[in-house]
Amino acid sequence: MTGIELHGKELEMLQYECHVSGAIAPKRPNMLLISENKIDYQPKSAIILCEQKIIRRQLRRARNDLRILSIEAYKSINNIEIIHSNDFETSEWMEEQRKLGKIDGFITSKEIFESLKFNGRRHTLLPDPKEGGGAYFLPIPYSDLIILLTRKSSPKSLTRVMTEKEGETIWWVQNQILGSLTSQELANTSILVRHRKVKSLMEEAERYKDLTLEQACHDSEGEVVDSEVHVELKIEKISKNGKRTIGIHRIIPYSKFEYATISLIRDWEVILREVSQDVPQDSYHDKIATAFIDLEE
């Protein structure tokens, strides 16, 4: 089953005497923009439809002069009363709207794009910008993550063949960070967890001139540690208008990722608490500043 289907249902899983015995790493975690133009080349006020709240906010962050609408909002504005039973029907309808010229593009998954064999151009919303400061798009929670559920009596030799080390890492980290979140909190959260080799991290640090990233690849004595896989973890929340982002980014040696994840969760909770409350007056001359970001919107 998918990771999002298991979210919040672990107690029910235990009642059926099942447990997570492994996971398969996402092969297609990134969403696609179906449009003739990339996001950077969209005309001003272009209409882009997107069902995922956090992706809409990422698009507004990249281009605040576009009309990024949910499907429900678009139907309401245009008095459309069509009801779709699943994501495939919704994507087919959005493709028809695009071909008719009523919208400029829409967001869908790679699975739906390949299943429906759309003819339009596709542009992958990648988590790594082409250059420093460029637009980037972190995946939605549990994106394309497949979980292996088995009963306790199931042979472990069978699951070892199917499961993947990176998939297990992604599930464990995301479940620790997101497992207690409500669906509303989950909707405004994007997260990226992946295994990285030191060589690729060093190349990225050199490309972006990122000294912090480069230091993460050295040990306490300054030597490059090239024998161990690292776990990269990024998590973000974005304001409704896309103008304010809070996030945390960690590069963790695989041997320490469990302890480091618990530490990250504590740091993330502190960050969320601090940025979501009003800033008190330092003196009677000051005005109370509003919170940096509203986590409820």
Give residue spans per PLM region.
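Residues that line or immediately flank small-molecule/substrate-binding pockets and catalytic motifs
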Residues: L6, N37, K110
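Flexible hinge/capping segments at coil-to-helix
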Residues: M31-I47, L66
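Solvent-exposed alpha-helices and their adjacent loops that cap or buttress functional pockets
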Residues: A25-P26, K38-Q42, K99, L138-P141
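Short beta-strand-centered segments that line the small-molecule binding cleft or hinge
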Residues: M1-N30
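Small-molecule-sensing regulatory modules
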Residues: R56-E297
